[in-house]
Amino acid sequence: MPCYSINLPAWACKLGSILAKISGTTCHGCYALKNRYIMPIQQAAMIRRLKALTHGSWTAAMITLITGHKYFRWHDSGDLQGPDHLKNIIEVCKATPDAKHWLPTREHKLLQFLDPDIIPKNLLIRVSATKVNGPAPSWWPWTSTVSTTTKTCPAPDQGGKCLDCRACWSRHTPNVVYAQH
């Protein structure tokens, strides 16, 4: 990852925690529920972050942490927790205009009535497909899919790193295809 990110416990994902139990979904075999974030110290930190979402100074704290950085990824583990969480992320993005933000999400319900035109230009919300080899959601301009046969994400061929790729943050990339892992 070419930037800082924030993660939350994957078990707290509203939709993802359900999909993780269903074979053939993009959350089945979730890396964050397996090897990636299972150490007790990592779990404790993610639980603290989850609890902090409702703290009155969360938005100001995130603005302080992100200011001065060029890129930021929301939720390399976890997902949106509700409308207030999304609203606060939008406020953080408005206050950090020099940073490009990428917010991948499967929480479709939170976006279905949101006009993409009101989202700050430095925030790319990428709606993720729910099924492996399934179609991208057609109602949102920026999406991601997971495939067993093809990919556009170069990370698997680059030691798991983005290197100079920033497609996930780009409004010029309508869909990013990730290899199933």
Predicted regions and their residues:
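Class I S-adenosyl-L-methionine
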Residues: 1-181
